[in-house]
């Protein structure tokens, strides 16, 4: 447990991209803290959204702009250990952004994604079990 601003309600996810940390506020100015990978330069964002869907071992379909940048990527990948979304995914609003696991745990703490927030599979499984649909997510730069 770590201290956080008392301005956030219990159950809120606060993502600090500069710190490369995700906080799940538990109440009374306390939170669980997780390390994350964040968007690389040109792919960062800030704002408030909510968890709109949750998936275990999600399939992955790279967006068309990603396929243009990386034609070597598959057009679709079934969920599983090799899938870049990892063990769980929390979908953010109507965007293509997610909080998800990773098949590259060594990238946690780095700015490497296309705007999603990646966690170790162990951490995302824990977070997934703690948050319901509709959970408020605040992304700070």
Residue locations for each model-derived region?
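General beta-strand recognition
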Residues: 21-23, 50, 98
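Conserved, function-defining micro-sites of small-solute handling proteins
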Residues: 36
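N-terminal secretory signal peptides
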Residues: 1-33, 43
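Exported/periplasmic cell-wall-interacting domains
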Residues: 8, 28, 33, 42-48, ...
């Amino acid at each position: 447990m770590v201290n956080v601003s008392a301005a956030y309600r219990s159950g809120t996810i606060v993502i600090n991209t500069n710190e490369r940390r995700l906080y799940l506020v538990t109440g009374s100015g306390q939170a669980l803290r997780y390390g994350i990978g964040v968007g690389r330069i040109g792919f960062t964002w800030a704002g408030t959204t909510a968890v709109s869907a949750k998936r275990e071992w999600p399939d992955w379909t790279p967006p068309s702009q990603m396929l243009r940048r990386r034609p070597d990527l598959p057009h679709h990948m079934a969920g599983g250990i090799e899938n870049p979304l990892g063990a769980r995914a929390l979908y953010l609003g109507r965007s293509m952004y997610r909080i998800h696991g990773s098949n590259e745990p060594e990238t946690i703490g780095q700015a490497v994604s296309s705007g999603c927030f990646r966690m170790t599979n162990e951490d995302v499984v824990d977070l997934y079990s703690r948050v319901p649909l509709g959970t408020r997510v605040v992304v700070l730069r």
